[in-house]
Regions:
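Extended, charge-rich alpha-helical interface modules
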Residues: 1-85
């Protein structure tokens, strides 16, 4: 199946970012309750970029749903995103 053009746009944007920048992008979504198709592409591309880099996202992603309930930090020792709070 072909990726949607907006997913591809976000995926390319995130591929050029450093991990701290990706964490900042994630944390800007915390508490945002608005939902649109565009946000779905954005959020999935963001999670996919963390996964592409081999980062453990199990605190925020169960393979189906992404939780933006808490901000995260990057734990370099364990190569994972850890929730704060």
């Amino acid at each position: 199946m072909q990726q949607h053009i907006y997913y591809t746009k976000y995926a390319l944007q995130f591929a050029d970012m450093q991990i701290p920048e990706l964490v900042t992008v994630f944390n800007h979504q915390v508490g945002n309750t608005g939902w649109t198709g565009m946000r779905a592409y954005h959020d999935q591309a963001l999670i996919d970029e963390f996964l592409r880099r081999g980062i453990d996202v199990s605190d925020i992603y169960n393979g189906k749903a992404i939780s933006f309930a808490h901000p995260v930090r990057y734990d370099i020792t364990y190569n994972r995103l850890a929730t704060i709070g």
